[in-house]
Amino acid sequence: VSCTGSKDCYAPCRKQTGCPNAKCINKSCKCYGC
């Protein structure tokens, strides 16, 4: 998922992992587990 900031990643990562833990790194989302 492309992003401009970490908050762009929270919703897609919550869908993937069930948790909104995420960071935007090099304009793409990195999802972390709970």
From Swiss-Prot:
Q: Which residues carry this modification: Cysteine amide?
A: C34
Which InterPro entries does this chain map to? Scorpion_toxin-like_sf (IPR036574), Scorpion_toxinS_K_inh (IPR001947)
Tell me which residues are marked as the site Aromatic residue of the functional dyad: Y32
Q: Which GO terms describe its cellular component?
A: extracellular region
GO: which molecular function terms?
ion channel inhibitor activity; potassium channel regulator activity; toxin activity
Question: Using the chain's own numbering, where are the disulfide bonds?
Answer: C3-C24, C9-C29, C13-C19, C31-C34
Q: Which SUPFAM superfamilies match?
A: Scorpion toxin-like
Question: Principal place where this protein is found?
Answer: secreted
Regarding tissue, the record states: Expressed by the venom gland.
Going by the UniProt record, its keywords in alphabetical order are:
Amidation, Calcium-activated potassium channel impairing toxin, Disulfide bond, Ion channel impairing toxin, Neurotoxin, Potassium channel impairing toxin, Secreted, Toxin, Voltage-gated potassium channel impairing toxin
Q: Where does the record place it? A: Secreted
Q: PROSITE patterns in the record, alphabetically?
A: SCORP_SHORT_TOXIN
Q: Which family does it belong to?
A: Belongs to the short scorpion toxin superfamily. Potassium channel inhibitor family. Alpha-KTx 06 subfamily.
Give the domain section of the comments.
Answer: Has the structural arrangement of an alpha-helix connected to a beta-sheet by disulfide bonds (CSalpha/beta).
The entry's function note states: Blocks voltage-gated potassium channels Kv1.2/KCNA2 (IC(50)=0.12-0.8 nM), KCa3.1/KCNN4 (IC(50)=1-2.2 nM), Shaker B (IC(50)=2.39-80 nM), Kv1.1/KCNA1 (IC(50)=37-45 or no activity, depending on the study), Kv1.3/KCNA3 (IC(50)=150-180 or no activity, depending on the study).
Anything else known: Negative results: shows very weak or no activity on KCa1.1/KCNMA1, KCa2.1/KCNN1, KCa2.2/KCNN2, KCa2.3/KCNN3, Kir2.3/KCNJ4.
Protein name according to UniProt: Potassium channel toxin alpha-KTx 6.2
Organism encoding this protein? Scorpio palmatus
